[in-house]
């Protein structure tokens, strides 16, 4: 039986491809020109799943991924993984630093290497491209003089490593997520993360506090919260949230129900195992057993048996 491919941000030689291979998903890769195209391939049935970047340790969230998941047709995150990000400066054989006037790379690459470029290539022009591998391909074709990409892309495109380890901060990592159409959730592991997008009814004083309170009173730690414009009109935003725990945890389920009451829309984006193995600290009074005991007590009250 033919297995559907897994989509990723291509072309060959991107960190997204490296993440796909590291995930060892056992499917053929489907290269896509943009993050949006990779997610569209899943929605349209051309791919079973997609592997896309969602957060950089240097630049924060990847807005193209957040906005597509929050506002496009429903998809859910089923897994995550982290990939070390190490850039190299690649060029055609014989290229030296003094020859470089135009450098191509993904927009996320520039901020991670800005200081190095200012110190070593202060007069160069930065050319933002759809991916670092696309920059390598354009360097091979002569459209740019050099590319910021993974060193592994050099062999793919017949380039040489002009400078390895191009970065401002060592040990940078990017978190990637595996995305699928809605399906039964992965079982909770005790070391889980839940992602969602919360849309306000309207912007008003205390709106963010209302959202945060639903988590705080249940002892749920947020690992990410990011406001993003909805695109509908100026001043209208949604909040992307990552929290510790699984929707099958009583405290997380209760928090989502609370958000449902105070928000215009809550888009559930998945509960899945954390790749770092971090476990949530369950505050006294917020365990599943304590929620169950409280619910049983309320049930007795309603039947006149306190």
List PLM regions with ranges:
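Domain-level signature for soluble enzymes in the chorismate/prephenate branch of the shikimate pathway
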Residues: 1-306
